[in-house]
Regions:
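Glycine-rich flexible loops
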Residues: 1-153
């Protein structure tokens, strides 16, 4: 089920690791299929070792349709984003060192983008959500709250 998309997700995860946007098993990728199913990367698995059968297919309520691995610990937040933002079809959760550091600055709610190429790619300044514990739905709640019309945070 969804073999080609699973391959693309794994390849994207390998690229995230190569460019140090994630490390070890941190971060996750998920995609909403046109038919409504959600594909989620498994928890605790390095992308370079991942194969299609490791991916989890679930519905918006978190019921597993296909897959035997444990889904990402951020699944509650991911599903909240997909439910709250029907226009979003992919969630890429990285652990970029600089972005993580910026997110820890108290009171900072937006990252001012001042490099033209980055501004074009980001569509302007980038909203920042408050820190939330790993596996908490709070990340999803905050993402939906601060990004009603933004695609990147």
């Amino acid at each position: 089920m969804f073999s080609e998309v699973k391959k693309e997700i794994i390849e994207a995860g390998i690229m995230l690791d190569r460019y140090e946007l994630v490390s070890l098993t941190c971060g996750n990728l998920s995609v909403r299929m046109p038919s409504g199913e959600i594909l989620v990367t498994p928890s605790g698995m390095m992308y370079e070792k991942m194969v299609e059968d490791d991916m989890i297919v679930m519905d918006l309520d978190g019921n597993v349709i296909e897959g035997t691995r444990k889904p990402s610990s951020d699944t509650p937040a991911i599903l909240h984003i997909f439910r709250g933002r029907p226009d979003i079809n992919a969630v890429i959760h990285t652990h970029q060192p600089y972005a993580t550091a910026i997110s820890l600055i108290p009171g900072l709610t937006e990252f001012r983008v001042c490099i033209t190429a980055l501004a074009n790619a980001a569509g302007g300044n980038v909203p920042i959500t408050p820190y939330s514990a790993a596996g908490s739905i709070d990340m999803g709640i905050d993402t939906v709250k601060v990004t009603p019309h933004k695609e990147k945070i």
